[in-house]
Amino acid sequence: MKQVAIVGIQGVPAKYGGFETLVENIIGDNCSPEVRYTVFCSGKDYATRLNTYKNVRLKYIPLFHANGVQSTPYDILSMLKCLHGYDTVVILGVSGCIFLPVFRLLFRKRLVANIDGLEHRRAKWGKFTKWFLRTSEAMAVRYADVVIADNKGIQDYVRETYHKEAVLIAYGGDQVLRNISEERQMEILRKYGVTPGNYAVSVCRIEPENNSHVICEAFASGGRDIVFVGNWERSEYSRGLKQKYAEYSNIRMVNAVYDLDELYALRNWCCCYVHGHSAGGTNPSLVEAMFFGKPV
C-alpha cells in the first residue's frame, strides 16, 4: 500500500477554504484502496483533534496556524515530519516551498505540488512578501516531480514562465449533488430566513481581495436578500463588515457552512450567485455554483 502525505492545508474536516474542500473530495469514498493518506492539520485551528477521519490518518502541527505569516513555518514543519514513511508528499500551496531545495536533499521519493493561483500577484502583499512567494513558487515548480494546475491559465503560466509542463486537473462540481427532499430543502431555507428564488448566495473568505465590502455595500443599497457565507470572525476586516452591516436584515452574514445538505439547498433555490474574487486560482465554490446553472 502506498503511503501519501498531504501538507499545506488547515486540515480536515474542512472548515476553511478551497484546498481543504479539495482534500475532502480526495479522501473518504474516493480513496483508492491501494493508497493510505495522512493529512497534516493545524493543532491551533482544531479544538478537537481526531486521530482518523474518513479512514485517513490525521497528524497535527501544534505550534502554528496554517494561514497568514505562520503558514511558512507550518508547512516546513509538516514537510519535516514527512521525511520517513511516505512514498509521495503532496504540497498544496507554495508558502513553505522555499524549503524545497533542502527538503529534496532529504526526501528522494515522489513530490507533487499544486501551486494554486499566483499568490505573489495579490495586491495585499508588500514587496518582500511578493518576492518571497514568487521565489517559493519557483522552487515548487523546479523541485516537484509533478506540478498541478487547476485551470488552463495556470498551466499556460507555468509553461511560459518556467518552461515546464504542469498537469491540468480542473475542479468538478458534481460532488454538490445531494439526495435531499424538497421538504427538507424548504426547512433549510426557513432556517436562513429566505424564500425560493428571492435571494442571492455568496460563499468566500471575507477579505478585501474578494471584494466582500463591495458585495455588502451593493446589497445594502439594493435591498435584495443575500446569504453571505464566510469567515466573519477571522480578521479585523471581516468583523468590521459584520458590525457595519448588522442592521441590514437582508444581508445574512453566516459563518462557514460545511453541511452539504444546507449548501445544496441554498444554491439550488437562489436567484443568482455572487462572486467577487479579484485574485487567486480556480475557486471551488464558484465551480460548484455554476453546476446549478445559476447566473453568476
Per-segment meaning from a language model:
Residues 265-281, 294-295:
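Acidic donor-binding loop of glycosyltransferase active sites
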Residues 5-7, 189-210, 216-229:
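Conserved donor-binding/catalytic core segment of Leloir-type glycosyltransferases
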Residues 2, 9-15, 29-66, 153-161, ...:
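N-terminal strand-loop element at the rim of the active site
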Residues 230, 238-260:
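Nucleotide-activated donor-binding/catalytic signature segment of Leloir-type glycosyltransferases, i.e.
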